């Protein structure tokens, strides 16, 4: 009887430890994904990129960072349109430049009423774990939302 109770306690302890470990791993996963999403959104909407004339390059190997801004939170329409045009052919390379190699991502620029003005990337499926970062920007002289989704 004592052996049965001891085995029961050991099984419960092992199961509890496994659940706690899974919970910690999931929290770590979301924290890392959140950090990557915030960093990518900051680079995109607050910087011009490096070099700041990256739109003139045909090859991403010369691009250290991709920024869409004319100035902080004011997006350059030409840069946005160039990135959107590159979506089909250069998505994987753009992910790498943004530091999102382990994830997929998308962004969209919307009117305040959620009407989409521009979008880039791959949309997540229903089962994907997704982090959203929303920023307020100026685009085409109008206040809009910039929404970045990072998922796996």
Q: Where do the protein language model's features map onto the residues?
A:
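N-terminal signal-anchor/signal peptide hydrophobic helix marking the start
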Residues: 1-8
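Long, compositionally biased, intrinsically disordered regions
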Residues: 11-152
């Amino acid at each position: 009887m004592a052996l049965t109770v001891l085995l029961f306690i050991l099984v419960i302890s092992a199961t509890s430890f496994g659940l706690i470990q899974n919970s910690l791993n999931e929290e770590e996963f979301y924290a890392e994904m959140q950090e990557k999403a915030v960093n990518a959104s900051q680079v995109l909407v607050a910087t011009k990129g490096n070099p700041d004339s990256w739109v003139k390059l045909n090859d991403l190997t010369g691009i250290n960072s991709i920024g869409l801004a004319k100035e902080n939170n004011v997006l350059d329409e030409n840069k946005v349109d160039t990135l959107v045009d590159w979506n089909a052919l250069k998505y994987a390379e753009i992910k790498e430049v943004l530091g999102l190699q382990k994830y997929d991502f998308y962004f969209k620029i919307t009117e305040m009423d959620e009407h989409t003005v521009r979008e880039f990337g791959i949309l997540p499926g229903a089962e994907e774990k997704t982090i959203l970062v929303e920023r307020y920007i100026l685009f085409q002289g109008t206040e809009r939302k910039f929404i970045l989704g990072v998922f796996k």
